[in-house]
């Protein structure tokens, strides 16, 4: 076995001898070189081991070791110092652990802690587990998951069931690791549980190979994430059952009642020709056939109203009545009216809105159609508007509701009263475009404009007779 002295650096080795040198007078006698015993006089013939152990023990020999020769100076290149020796073990004469510890001491690697050194350390001295496999008893044994470890150990190292345990995957090793490579258990019960894991793996094989497989892929370690993440697994299954129910093994794992999502299932041959694309009747959630559970009133709903594609036509109108009549208990249900009859009326209303100013409920006749005839037998007049007919009837009845306030004259039409008032006021809002003459009524202006048209025609005839049109001139140019 390998026994190592835990030194932090070269200063730890020189601290005690340096203090002894500071308090020792220079007159102390020195050991002559000839009085030094030979290497053969020491047990084992190891002079270097004896010298280092004697200097570390203290006393006069310690002072003499460090005062002999020139003044000691701290070596610059040393990073590790200590004493080691190999002690043969009868049970394992060729144990690879001793060779690994020897190589780690020479190369400056971190050695595995001994049980005495680990027991003597306090929780504050060990902020993190010393060995790479210190977490193995806690990770792979279910009995050790609730053991009481030092508080600083739990602050520095993750727990066995933590979600971040996969980040430490390179440090994990299979459960059949030598017990000597593990952290020392805190109690005899932990020691007995840790001794159950043994195997032929060598330390360097475990460090180089890493952890085989994923986290939680061995033995009892699989139960911990399943137990702690059961709620997450349930939510994932619920999400999968809603998004892709066809991939589930059976109807037992479905979250919705059977038939709840089968409202639009197709039945090609049940509805006759031309109705292969129409889905079947709405099935209530209580049962697959619609006979069990509540919601039996859904059976009478025809398929024409439940089509998600909005199919409407003569076929849906034909089979809806027969379908309701064939169903049990559907004789008292009134057959729905076909929606195909309401569409032409809607189109007509839209055309009426776009074509004219009247609303859809207006009873105005179409343009160029005189639907309002005079009720008087001797009169054959027809009118396109009702207000025109009302004005015409005032001629037959002699009713004159409009009276002038100046001369008290009555008129049957309001426009006649307006033009009459202009005679009293002298207002002439209409003017001729050619001569500028003004008129009180628009019809008077129109008659006057005809006079100018006749004068223009006469002047063009005169110019044509004189030959001005041959020169490219016209009356307008003159």
From Swiss-Prot:
Subcellular location, record wording: Nucleus
Region of interest called Disordered, as start-end residue ranges on this chain: 15-37
Sample GO molecular function, one term: RNA polymerase II cis-regulatory region sequence-specific DNA binding
Superkingdom of source: Eukaryota
Main subcellular location: nucleus
PROSITE patterns tied to this protein: ZINC_FINGER_C2H2_1 (PS00028), ZINC_FINGER_C2H2_2 (PS50157)
Induction behaviour: By nerve growth factor.
Pfam families reported for this sequence: zf-C2H2 (PF00096)
Xref: InterPro entries: Znf_C2H2_sf (IPR036236), Znf_C2H2_type (IPR013087)
GO BP of this protein: cellular response to growth factor stimulus; positive regulation of transcription by RNA polymerase II; regulation of transcription by RNA polymerase II
Disulfide bonds: none
Family of this protein: Belongs to the EGR C2H2-type zinc-finger protein family.
Full protein name: Early growth response protein 4
Organism: Rattus norvegicus (Rat)
